[in-house]
């Protein structure tokens, strides 16, 4: 699996209207990190950046020793940072169509850029 994954996204906490949050991969310099930071920089007004040490969702498994996948998280409110998290208030009234739509747009931009990212390789020796 590891050899086939060039960039991964842990999609979590994407439905509210609060500020976008970014949690990098363990190394912070993978293609997923660069891509996510680029999209957030140019398509979101404000972003709260976290350290990988602030992890707490499934990225713990994806980036754990021996697994080491290039996975990042783009969230709205980061888990554990809002009072509704894991309470009865963390329900459908907390999320909105607008919040989900903007998150969808951001992830779609990431995938679009990723699909257009090419590395060209010459098939001839010397100059063509």
Spans of model-derived segments:
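Secretory-pathway/membrane protein signature
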Residues: 1-128
């Amino acid at each position: 699996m590891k050899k086939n994954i060039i960039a991964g996204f842990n999609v979590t906490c994407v439905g509210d209207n609060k500020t976008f949050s970014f949690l990098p991969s363990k190394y912070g310099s993978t293609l997923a990190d660069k891509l996510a930071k680029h999209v957030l920089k140019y398509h979101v007004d404000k972003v709260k950046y976290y350290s990988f040490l602030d992890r707490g969702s499934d990225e713990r498994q994806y980036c754990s020793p021996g697994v080491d996948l290039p996975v990042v998280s783009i969230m709205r409110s980061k888990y554990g940072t809002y009072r509704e998290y894991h309470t009865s208030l963390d329900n459908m009234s907390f999320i909105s169509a607008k919040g989900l739509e903007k998150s969808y747009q951001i992830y779609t931009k990431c995938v679009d850029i990723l699909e257009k990212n090419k590395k060209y390789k010459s098939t001839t020796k010397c100059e063509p």
